[in-house]
């Protein structure tokens, strides 16, 4: 699968095993890992390899995980920017959980995450026929909260002191978006 975005040279494609080095470096970066609600510590290379192997092998058909890739206009060489996902797609309720990570610091703040997130949501609504996309985010992840609100996600609730990290209890925020709300 190959999905273009609104930024020239930025597209979404299927994850591949040769993405392991970039994928692994982010999974092991403590600053990136601290933004994930699903893990408290960076993943080992073995854990990361297992996760990537499951994704590439189609072990979770209810989920779509795509690489965010920037192609050099002169060389055509790919730069692996991040991963965007629609997980736990429900076949009756027609909703899925959204997730995104921009792994390379040099690619942050350039609009790549917003373009990739919007494209993935459009794919979810138009191709997968979802009626709702939802997500959760740790409350102190201000950059992510800002992105989601800019895309039209609406705040649905707060799980107070739900997530223990770095010796502190953190709130977990829940957001969702319907097709008519996506910006």
Residue ranges and their predicted role:
Residues 113, 117, 140-144, 161-166:
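Short glycine/proline-centered loop/turn elements that form peptide/ligand docking sites
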Residues 126-136:
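Conserved GNAT acetyl-CoA-binding A-motif
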Residues 109-123, 145-150:
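Conserved acetyl-CoA-binding loop-helix of GNAT-fold acetyltransferases
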Residues 104-106, 110, 139-140:
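Active-site acidic-Proline motif in GNAT/NAT acetyltransferases
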Residues 22, 97, 115, 132, ...:
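Amphipathic alpha-helical recognition patches that constitute DNA-binding helices
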Residues 148, 153, 175:
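Conserved active-site tyrosine of GNAT-family acetyltransferases
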Residues 134-137, 154-171:
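Conserved catalytic-core motifs of GNAT/GCN5-like acyltransferases
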Residues 1-106, 177-183:
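GNAT-family acyltransferases
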């Amino acid at each position: 699968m190959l999905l273009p975005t609104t930024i020239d040279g930025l597209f979404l494609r299927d994850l591949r095993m040769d993405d392991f080095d970039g994928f692994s470096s982010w999974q092991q970066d403590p600053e990136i890992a601290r933004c994930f609600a699903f893990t408290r510590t960076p993943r080992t290379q073995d854990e990361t390899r297992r996760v990537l192997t499951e994704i590439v092998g189609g072990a979770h058909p209810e989920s779509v995980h795509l690489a965010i890739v920037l192609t050099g206009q002169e060389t055509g060489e790919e730069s692996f920017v991040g991963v965007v996902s629609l997980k736990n797609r429900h076949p009756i309720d027609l909703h899925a959980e959204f997730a995104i990570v921009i792994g390379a610091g040099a690619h942050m703040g350039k609009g790549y995450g917003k373009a990739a997130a919007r494209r993935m949501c459009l794919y979810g609504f138009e191709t997968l026929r979802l009626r709702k996309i939802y997500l959760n985010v740790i409350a102190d992840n201000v950059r992510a909260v800002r992105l989601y609100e800019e895309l039209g996600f609406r705040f649905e609730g707060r799980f107070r002191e739900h997530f223990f990290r770095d010796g502190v209890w953190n709130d977990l925020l829940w957001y969702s978006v319907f097709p008519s709300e996506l910006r």
